[in-house]
């Protein structure tokens, strides 16, 4: 396990690294506790906990960056707090208030300040808030007790083919990420467990990950592994898929604003047919972990589509997003939460 002294900040990858403190709050008798920081990273759970048998678990992911002045900056944490609430509602779990969510994130960052990546190192401090159903239980029903936990780890690029490395390669999969009217639009653990096999098959074929198509017709682009998709057309329009089974990415939502307001591009959120790929000169995967990863190739039904990686617009969006996240450029209202 890497320790702070031997971390190579510029080549971290995306893996678990134990840091000093995490925040834990408990839900009992109808309310959340105030929560506290603890140093122990192991949990003791009842063998009957619904999270272990029925997947009653949801989570979030957000990043803190170090600014040039040394401040810790969280990117759009209120959006993550709201999305976690939506996920909790879907699984009949008690919602975590925005206040408790922000408090937990801030305390974890302050307690693990030494793990915050240096300015412009290419790394960041990734926060993983999650809620799980615990306690003695056997039947298929909501838990009576819950844990809300936030831990953190320093991370680098999620995909190997990042913005500086020529882009990533993807292949469509016949597997479905989510069912119609299922849980695709929320961030619950079961969605990701179900994706492991498709990811394994894609990587064994030499690709970075797979692209999921819509579960009804298998003709429309949904998600790119654990990230959202966007494409740049030959006439410079920013297009991203619309579907109730796509997780609403905070990064994608932000890119739509930046593309429209800063780059003055036409922005569309609509269904994208897989056969439309030839209309794009650039394509990318976006999300908290992926940030913006340019796509250089998509394989589908023995046909291959190639894209500029990174293309000019993708690079502009990446630079603009990162400059806001690192405090170099003024951010839209409520996008940046300064800690400490």
Swiss-Prot record:
Signal sequence bounds: none
Modified residues (N6-(pyridoxal phosphate)lysine): 187
KW ATP-binding (keyword) present: no
Cofactor: pyridoxal 5'-phosphate
E.C. code: 2.6.1.42
Alphabetized CDD domains for the sequence: BCAT_beta_family (cd01557)
PROSITE patterns hit by this protein: AA_TRANSFER_CLASS_4
A Pfam short name: Aminotran_4
Pathway involvement of the protein, from the record: Amino-acid biosynthesis; L-isoleucine biosynthesis; L-isoleucine from 2-oxobutanoate: step 4/4; Amino-acid biosynthesis; L-leucine biosynthesis; L-leucine from 3-methyl-2-oxobutanoate: step 4/4; Amino-acid biosynthesis; L-valine biosynthesis; L-valine from pyruvate: step 4/4
Entry's Gene Ontology molecular function annotations: L-isoleucine-2-oxoglutarate transaminase activity; L-leucine-2-oxoglutarate transaminase activity; L-valine-2-oxoglutarate transaminase activity
Keywords: Amino-acid biosynthesis, Aminotransferase, Branched-chain amino acid biosynthesis, Pyridoxal phosphate, Transferase
Enzyme class: transferase
PANTHER family to which the protein is assigned, alphabetical: AMINO ACID AMINOTRANSFERASE (PTHR42825), BRANCHED-CHAIN-AMINO-ACID AMINOTRANSFERASE 3, CHLOROPLASTIC-RELATED (PTHR42825:SF2)
Family per similarity comment: Belongs to the class-IV pyridoxal-phosphate-dependent aminotransferase family.
Described purpose of this protein according to its UniProt entry: Acts on leucine, isoleucine and valine.
Protein name as it appears in the record: Branched-chain-amino-acid aminotransferase
Source organism (scientific name): Helicobacter pylori (strain J99 / ATCC 700824)
